[in-house]
Amino acid sequence: MKKLYKIDENVILQNGIIYDPFENKKYKSDIYIKNGLIKKIEENIKSNDGLIIDCNNKIITTGFVDIHAHFREPGQENKETIKTGSMSAMAGGFTDVCIMPNTSPPIDSPEAIRFVLDKAAALPINIHPIGAITRNQLGKEISEIGGMVKNGAVAISDDGLPVVNGNVLRFALEYSCNWYLY
C-alpha cells in the first residue's frame, strides 16, 4: 500500500472521531503516528514529539474506494489526467480508484493497462485500471482480456456503451471467468 504523503515528523491527531467500518463503531480518540505508522490510539495522548493536528469532531476513517472514475488519460488530458484525478481523489479521502476505459484511445490492451499503471506508479493513491470488454469499445470483438489482467486490469467494462452482439458479450463473459473476473 502506498503512503498518501510523506511527513518527516511524527504526528498526533487529537480529538478525532474514529470510525471503524469493520467493527461499525465510532469513538473519540487521539492517534499517534511515528515514522508514518500508527503507534497508538487512545484518549489524551501527550507528546512534544512532532506535529499536533486538532481534529475536533472530525471523522477519521480508512481510505475510501471509488469503483467508477473517469480520469480521461490517454487522449483527453484537457479534461483530466491520471495525476490530477489522483490528487483530487486523495483530497476527498480516496486511497483507491478504479478508472474506466473510455479514453481516447480506449484502455483495451495490455499496453494501455501498463501505460496507466506506469503513470500512476509515483502517485499517492492506488489506481486500478478497468479494461475495455471490446476493442475500441465498438462491441464487435473482445479485447485482450487475459493480457490486460496479466498486466494489472481488475475488471472489464465498455462503460456506458452496450455490447449489442449477444455472442460477443457471452464469449467475453465466459472467457473472463478464466481470469477470475465475475
Please state what every model-predicted region is.
Residues 16, 31, 36, 57, ...:
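Divalent metal-coordination and catalytic microenvironments
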Residues 103-115, 119-182:
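Histidine/acidic-residue-rich, glycine-tolerant segments that coordinate divalent metal ions
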Residues 58-120:
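Metal-associated gating/positioning segment near the N- to mid-region
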Residues 13, 51-53, 65, 98, ...:
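Hydrophobic/aromatic beta-strand patches that form the interior of the parallel beta-sheet core
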Residues 44-61:
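Active-site metal-binding motif and surrounding structural segment of the metallo-beta-lactamase
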Residues 1-47:
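N-terminal metal-binding scaffold of metallo-dependent hydrolase/deaminase domains
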